[in-house]
UniProtKB/Swiss-Prot annotation:
Protein name (Swiss-Prot/TrEMBL): Trehalose-6-phosphate phosphatase
Cofactor(s) the protein requires to work: Mg(2+); Mn(2+); Co(2+); Zn(2+)
Family: Belongs to the trehalose phosphatase family.
Pfam families named among the record's database cross-references: Trehalose_PPase (PF02358)
Pathway in which this enzyme or protein is active: Glycan biosynthesis; trehalose biosynthesis
Induction comment: By cold-shock, osmotic-shock and during the transition to stationary phase. Expression is partially dependent on RpoS.
GO BP annotations, alphabetical order: response to osmotic stress; trehalose biosynthetic process
Amino acid sequence: MTEPLTETPELSAKYAWFFDLDGTLAEIKPHPDQVVVPDNILQGLQLLATASDGALALISGRSMVELDALAKPYRFPLAGVHGAERRDINGKTHIVHLPDAIARDISVQLHTVIAQYPGAELEAKGMAFALHYRQAPQHEDALMTLAQRITQIWPQMALQQGKCVVEIKPRGTSKGEAIAAFMQEAPFIGRTPVFLGDDLTDESGFAVVNRLGGMSVKIGTGATQASWRLAGVPDVWSWLEMITTALQQKRENNRSDDYESFSRSI
């Protein structure tokens, strides 16, 4: 059973932090280009990353280029395109490549067909494709059928449903696989994973985090594998602010203790 999340984690423990972006750190907007992560939330993430020796990553369906732009001026480890591309703490990238001929043929087919559905949008991500229908929900079934046809023609591709979107991505890639990969690397290894996400695309991440004995947090309504729930993005912001406030207080207390110890020694 998923429980409401009302408390922050014990700060003395070692956590590895993973955050989805759209619908978790930032409100969903009619168009992806309109999404913004508030400056104070980015500052909080940086503080949390520093306190955790860098063990914080953004896990998203967006590309890593988009994630870096949204996280400026900070630079975090990332998993983009649902794990099809990943950047570790050292800046090394791990990318699943799609043969150029396949990517080109899929793109041509999708561009040709999606023109029949006004309001629907095709987002090409190199090795993956997203069919957005937030502005044209009446086309959901048709776009799902289109995506299924693509995966039948190219079985190395798989479907990933999300909120008002269906994605076509390399088979075997997922947010869960990305989190599992991070958890095998420094500085994440040996820590307890915490993952916050709002969408169907995040369920694979929840499954991995649960298996590792971590904290999985669903944002919003709907059935989920997550153990905890926050009602919406403002609740995520409030929860993060509680954590960062506690971290700052802990840091101030440590400085005070260090000063007192120094004073007694002279």
